[in-house]
Amino acid sequence: LFHFLISVPFKKQYLANIEKGINPLRWYEYAFSSSIMIVLLSVLFGITSIEGLLGVFGINAVMNLLGLLMEKMNPPNRTKTDWTAHFVGWIAGFIPWIIILFYLLNFGDLSLLPWFVLPGLSFYFLVFNLFAFNQILQYARVGKWKDYVYGEKSYVWLSLIGKSTLAWLVFLGIVLN
């Protein structure tokens, strides 16, 4: 849906924002879709209370909105990068993973988990955190990331890989349960 919106009705706004070194639509979409994804993952590991799932959703959404704040605080013509929003986002981003880890460790015998769970979860965790490293490279202006568009394309690929990975994890979790 997001990619349709930016390619058709919001294309001019999207391209104008990219020229300014900011993409608010990305961060709003991530705040929603990434939070849905982490909630689905949470459910797979036994988190079923509404307050627990709302907490995971909310703190994950805040993490993504801190990505938007990072962009707003650091326009392309800056002389110095303010990393505050980025590193507060790391803290917020790890909280849902810590909660999932607690549930995973309380599962009991991890050998009873389906074969795909631990490798899939590890890969998804890696991809999830590559978003933050992409932002570091982009705002530190390292190599190809000096060009905002390169970082933007990296976000698109990471999003595709992350969503596909989680879709397979959820699908396998449903089919094999």
What do the PLM-derived regions correspond to, one by one?
Residues 1-25, 34-177:
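Polytopic alpha-helical membrane-helix bundles and their juxtamembrane interface segments
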